Amino acid sequence: MTEDELNKLLLAGKIAAKARDEVSLDVKASAKVLDICEEVESIIIENKAFPSFPCNISINSEAAHYSPTINDEKRIPEGAVVKLDLGAHIDGFISDTAITISLDSRYQRLLDASKTALEAAITNFKAGLSIGEIGRVIEKVIRAQGYKPIRNLGGHLIRRYELHAGVFIPNVYERGLGVIQSDSVYAIEPFATDGGGEVVEGKSITIYSLKNPNIKGLSSRENELIDFIYTRFNYLPFSERWLKEFSTNVDELRNNIKNLVKKGALRGYPILIEIKKGVVSQFEHTVIVKGDSIIVSTKSL
């Protein structure tokens, strides 16, 4: 990792933290999800970075992957538990962070469980340690609070222009995941729930990424859209909202996206729902492993 790469990672983390901490104050009952996410993304762009992925706002039993669509009218309900998940990148060097806001004080202990688990995981995180041991730490902290970790969600290795780079950081103990590597970047994200401790895919898809830009048999318009996506986002996730420059015809745009997913050119990420409709909390930081040191790039300013 060069000094220039490290500086870009640190700045991307600082910008994401700024957006997270400022916009989390605007998460209130009746607020439009679209307004919140557009504010997040605007702050990132105003600070000369780009969103690493579309801002996620997942409410109550929604664990992840809800991002508002074009003209989305969804609002934050009274008493909601709201996960705000966002990231920034500079030249493909990525940050990823999340916070949970509860509009009902009854869920504060649930929030504390995932937040304390994140703090414990970071304290124990170091090069050479078994990745499974981080899962053990997270699971122990969450269960001690009387909740369940979500076993099929977790953190991940991050590489340039690659948000999920193949290494999984579990929320429970697992064998055979290798060890934490120096000169690497990881997202750590404990999820806690009062439900069953697992997520399943919902029907809605609001986030996409490029899967295979070389699929044969695409129409000229579909190829134009693929080129537009690659030029602007590389292989990072994107929202239909970010394609309005390509087409202002929403129905045409959605139809093209749907067809490109079916043909295997794009990948869709379904919303993830807690299996027993339990309420979910999440906290997340990006950590940079540099020699024997750990740098939390997304810590509050």
From Swiss-Prot:
Family the entry assigns: Belongs to the peptidase M24A family. Methionine aminopeptidase archaeal type 2 subfamily.
GO molecular function: aminopeptidase activity; initiator methionyl aminopeptidase activity; metal ion binding; metalloaminopeptidase activity; metalloexopeptidase activity
PANTHER family per UniProt: METHIONINE AMINOPEPTIDASE 2
Protein name stated in the entry: Methionine aminopeptidase
Binding locations of substrate: H65, H164
EC numbers for this chain: 3.4.11.18
Record flagged with keyword Amino-acid biosynthesis: no
Enzyme kind, highest EC tier: hydrolase
Residues reported to bind a divalent metal cation 2: D96, H156, E189, E284
Binding site for a divalent metal cation 1: D85, D96, E284
Gene: map
Cofactor stoichiometry and binding remark: Binds 2 divalent metal cations per subunit. Has a high-affinity and a low affinity metal-binding site. The true nature of the physiological cofactor is under debate. The enzyme is active with cobalt, zinc, manganese or divalent iron ions. Most likely, methionine aminopeptidases function as mononuclear Fe(2+)-metalloproteases under physiological conditions, and the catalytically relevant metal-binding site has been assigned to the histidine-containing high-affinity site.
Key words, A-Z: Aminopeptidase, Hydrolase, Metal-binding, Protease
One GO BP: proteolysis
GO CC term (a single one): cytoplasm
Role noted for this protein: Removes the N-terminal methionine from nascent proteins. The N-terminal methionine is often cleaved when the second residue in the primary sequence is small and uncharged (Met-Ala-, Cys, Gly, Pro, Ser, Thr, or Val).
Signal sequence segment: none
Oligomeric form and interacting partners: Monomer.
UniProt-listed Pfam families: Peptidase_M24 (PF00557)
